[in-house]
């Protein structure tokens, strides 16, 4: 299982995460996130070349988990402020 760590910032604007290190193939992650009034951040991931997990833990966030095969995940945030997440992409 290969793991690649990246930093993204959760904002209301679309963000692109590029990870060239998984299995020697380039994988582009198009991340659109929205901070809701209840402190939820919805992340849509497109462009993953195989199924995997997208995880992140950071101050200001309770947890972050996205199932890449579903392409959608919910991040529970402690506040609506912008937070930086250390993201890992795990694949078997």
Model-based region annotation:
Residues 34-51:
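Short, surface-exposed beta-strand/strand-loop-strand elements in extracellular ectodomains
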């Amino acid at each position: 299982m290969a793991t690649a760590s990246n930093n993204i910032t959760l904002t209301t604007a679309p963000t692109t995460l590029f990870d060239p290190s998984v299995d020697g193939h380039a994988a582009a992650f198009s991340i659109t996130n929205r901070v809701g009034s209840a402190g939820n951040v919805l992340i849509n991931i497109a462009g993953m070349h195989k199924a995997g997990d997208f995880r992140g833990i950071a101050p200001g966030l309770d947890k972050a988990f996205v199932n890449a095969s579903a392409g959608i995940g919910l991040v529970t945030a402690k506040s609506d402020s912008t937070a930086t997440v250390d993201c890992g992409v795990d694949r078997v």
